[in-house]
Amino acid sequence: MKIDIGVDNKCGDFVTYMKDEAFNSQLHYISAISSFPISKMMELLPLSGNETIYESVNVLSSVDLSDLNRCIRSLYQRIIFSPLPKQSDANTDDSNNSNNANMQMETGKIKTDRHWICIEGIQTMFQYSQLKDPVEAHASLNDTMLRLRLLQNKCPSIEILFLLPPHEAPEFIQSLQEHDISRNNIPHRRQGKRFKRDNTGILIGDYIWKYYI
């Protein structure tokens, strides 16, 4: 699992990930604060000729941590326990699978599935959950994070990314700055600016970084 600060330029990363022909890539985008940046992505990757890629983008909405927990549980079932083909469709599925395998063999390599789960707006989800039930908010967060960790342990090819604005993870940013300073032997000067915590007293980006990543 990773944290990325700044969400404005992620479409380039999405396109690079989805265009990698060595894999059957799937992007799962979960957000509480915005819609998927489809227009920006289409500027980089036109829809015409790339329909299969866009069909592999799964956009989910999550208002609070309970919603997020349900989304992650659903993805867990989808990724780990993929349903077997129905018996009545066996011949058709076998034929399709054979054709797909032949096409992949012609390219010299059979593609494997991989998944990228991007979560945006975790602070907003936490705040909504805190307003309803603080105890349940922490329980939902813990269950979600443990399920994500279990999912990644079972499928190491899965990438999990939390997209955060800088003010939601100031301690994480400071750790990156201190790492760069120590690596480059630059004299360290502490910044005077302090980020304000939200009304729950918790910046969830820093919390996730400290206890789950």
Swiss-Prot record:
One of its GO terms (cellular component) is cytoplasm. This is Chromosome segregation in meiosis protein 2. Belongs to the CSM2 family. It is found in: Cytoplasm; Nucleus. Transmembrane segments: none annotated. Keywords: Cytoplasm, DNA damage, DNA repair, Meiosis, Nucleus. Involved in chromosome segregation during meiosis. Promotes efficient recombinational repair and functions in the protection of the genome from spontaneous and induced DNA damage like mutations and gross chromosomal rearrangements (GCRs). InterPro entries: Csm2 (IPR031783), P-loop_NTPase (IPR027417). GO terms for biological process: meiotic cell cycle; recombinational repair.
